[in-house]
Amino acid sequence: MTFNRRNDRERETSEFEEKMLFVNRTSKTYQGGRRFRFAALVILGDRNGRVGMGIGKAKEVPVAIEKAKAIARKNMITVPVENGTIPHEIVGENSTSRVLLKPAGPGTGVIAGTVPRSIAELAGITNMLSKELGSRNKINVAYAVFDGLKNLRTAKQVREIRGLDGQVRAAQAGGEL
């Protein structure tokens, strides 16, 4: 029985859906002519709250994409998704790019630019509003969206961080703080 490494690799990543957002070609001029290199921006997600982003660079596009996928697997984050949307409004920042992410009601859909929409859909967010502010460079916007999603907290997580878990319940029951 023969084994095919490519099939094994595809089986490994089958839990994640991938989306290639952007391929950039750069060139360097040498005495004999130009040499091209490629950079690929890839998003991986399971549509269930886990999403990762990677940028791979290589002399050929397929190699750059594979590198980007490997980097995206290493940079996975978990996004708190409540009823198909994010728990609260947040602004993600990277360089001169800022992205405003807002929760939306059921049936709204993902109203966003191409980069925030792709990341939100692969994270499992079905209702969200977004606005890109400042620079709209795809790489910087992607990093800004990830910054925003990484800093999201549910109400329960905030209570635990602040140590208010028991006090909030007492206040809701009509007790003293």
Swiss-Prot record:
PROSITE patterns in alphabetical order: RIBOSOMAL_S5 (PS00585), S5_DSRBD (PS50881)
Gene Ontology MF terms in the entry: rRNA binding; structural constituent of ribosome
Example of a GO biological process term: translation
Entry keyword Acetylation: no
Domain S5 DRBM: 16-79
Cellular component, GO, one term: small ribosomal subunit
Family: Belongs to the universal ribosomal protein uS5 family.
Entry's free-text remark on domains: The N-terminal domain interacts with the head of the 30S subunit; the C-terminal domain interacts with the body and contacts protein S4. The interaction surface between S4 and S5 is involved in control of translational fidelity.
Complex and partners: Part of the 30S ribosomal subunit. Contacts proteins S4 and S8.
Function: With S4 and S12 plays an important role in translational accuracy. Located at the back of the 30S subunit body where it stabilizes the conformation of the head with respect to the body.
Protein name, entry field: Small ribosomal subunit protein uS5
Origin organism lineage: Bacteria, Thermotogati, Deinococcota, Deinococci, Deinococcales
Gene that this polypeptide is encoded by: rpsE
